[in-house]
């Protein structure tokens, strides 16, 4: 792991999550609501359409992944994935977010890799930690070539039941070509395996991004089978 100085923390730590037992049917929603606290949204820790994140949480509850990997991590989403996973949890980011993520992940077994997800060195480190992930989230480099590179490299680390999740695949993404990048285009061009699209066209506005309450996300789930 890179020894660079930790990122400066600009916000207070969220209080520990103890609201609902994991056995409670409302556990996924409680996790999402915890992630969508106003100060986390304001600081950019949550950039997901609320209804998409909520639907994803219930899907994850049913899928019940063991090992999970997130490429491009802000904190809140990684916390959600990790709480609904039963095995190893890993995150990769070109920014050093260890101090920030530690506030969400305190007391949990997890690993953060500070480096370029495209580099062979980073990929070797991830593989040495775990070489079979049930869920890999690609939400880092949003350029077409960057998304493709992450997809080609990390698909080799999928377990026999593993899937890859992409964020920002909404074909009508309000920021596509800009902050939303070209993920939607890569998703559109991906013509192998099976694809499931989760896209909210009308939202309650619980989470907003630059004044938008919907069409700034879109979740795509890809399976090689």
What role is predicted for each listed range?
Residues 1-137, 141-225:
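A short alpha-helical cap/connector motif
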């Amino acid at each position: 792991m890179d020894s660079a100085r930790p990122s400066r923390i600009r916000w207070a730590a969220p209080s520990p999550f103890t609201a609902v037992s994991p056995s409670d049917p409302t556990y996924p929603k409680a996790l999402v609501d915890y992630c969508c606290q106003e100060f986390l949204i304001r600081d950019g820790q949550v950039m997901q359409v609320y209804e998409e994140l909520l639907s994803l949480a219930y899907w994850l509850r049913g899928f019940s992944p063991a090992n999970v990997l997130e490429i491009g991590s802000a904190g809140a989403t990684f916390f959600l994935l990790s709480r609904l996973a039963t095995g190893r949890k890993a995150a990769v980011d070109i920014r050093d977010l260890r101090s920030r993520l530690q506030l969400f992940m305190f007391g949990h077994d997890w690993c953060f890799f500070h480096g370029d997800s495209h580099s062979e060195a980073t990929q070797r480190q991830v593989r040495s930690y775990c070489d079979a992930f049930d869920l890999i989230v690609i939400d880092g480099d949003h350029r077409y070539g960057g998304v493709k590179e992450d997809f080609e490299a990390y698909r080799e680390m999928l377990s026999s039941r593993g899937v890859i999740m992409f964020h920002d695949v909404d074909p009508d993404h309000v920021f596509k070509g800009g902050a939303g990048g070209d993920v939607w285009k890569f998703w559109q061009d991906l013509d192998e395996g099976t694809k499931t699209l989760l896209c909210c066209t009308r939202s309650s506005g619980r989470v907003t991004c630059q004044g938008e309450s919907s069409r700034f996300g879109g979740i795509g789930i890809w399976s090689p089978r």
